[in-house]
Regions:
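Structural signature of FAD isoalloxazine-binding scaffolds in flavoprotein oxidoreductases
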Residues: 11-17
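Predominant activation on well-ordered alpha-helical scaffold segments within soluble catalytic domains
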Residues: 17, 23, 52-59, 109, ...
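A short helix-breaking turn/cap at a secondary-structure junction
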Residues: 23-106, 168-172
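Short helix-loop capping/hinge segments that flank enzyme active sites or metal/cofactor-binding pockets
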Residues: 85, 89, 143-202
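Short connector loops at secondary-structure junctions
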Residues: 89, 117-137
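Acyltransferase
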Residues: 100-126, 154-162, 168-173, 202
Length: 202
């Protein structure tokens, strides 16, 4: 099956269910037809019972799509396959943290060993700004949610809910069409995009 992942909506459910989920690299899989939430973060990816299953689905859905302006061309995608050293960076200080299950850490380290055995060089990288990543994620995601979902007004796009006036119809459509969490994200996104709060968040 397929899912969309903005901040973990493929990877985390897959982990909880004991299956494999892949958030694909930006631009490798078309997002045409996807209702955008956070455009710089949203990606479509497969779920499967094994890495091999996920790989097969990925081969089918990846590739350039002229209907998606963020979709990478085959020429650009091919550059990453050109010669040179095969290096993968792993932020080990982030992996070796309190609270990581021993079995998860064991499987992770075994995966690193398998990667090395295929000819890749694995380097420990220091991402010293990682502790700020969640704050940055929330600001970007909320702002993009507010912008992207503004079009779903029940007139041009989305669910249309009747009301006594056009204004009431607009409010009813937004209320009926979006759940509480989505409405919260829209509100917070509108807040962080307000000019008066620019210095506070950016």
């Amino acid at each position: 099956s397929l899912g969309s992942d903005t901040g973990g909506s493929i990877r985390q459910p897959a982990s909880f269910c004991g299956i494999v989920g892949l958030k694909t690299t930006y631009g490798n899989v078309s997002r045409f037809g996807l209702m955008a939430m956070g455009s710089s973060l949203d990606q479509i990816g497969p779920f499967g019972n094994s890495v091999e299953d996920v790989e097969e689905v990925y081969k089918l859905i990846s590739g350039h799509d002229p209907m998606d302006s963020t979709s990478l061309t085959e020429e650009v995608r091919g550059r990453s396959k050109e010669g040179g050293r095969k290096i993968i960076g792993v932020p080990m200080s982030f992996v070796n943290r309190e609270g990581v299950d021993d079995e998860v850490l064991k499987n992770f380290n075994e995966s690193i060993d398998k990667i090395k055995s295929t000819g890749y060089e694995v380097k420990d990288v220091d991402i010293n700004q990682l502790e700020k990543a969640l704050s940055v994620y929330y600001i970007l995601m909320f702002a993009e949610v507010s912008s992207n979902l503004a079009r779903y007004d029940g007139i041009r796009y989305g669910l249309s809910h009747p009301g006594e006036t056009s204004i009431k119809s607009y409010f009813e459509s937004r209320t009926a069409g979006f759940g509480a969490e989505v409405r919260r994200r829209i509100l917070l996104g509108t807040y962080v995009l307000s000019s008066g709060y620019y210095d506070a968040y950016y």
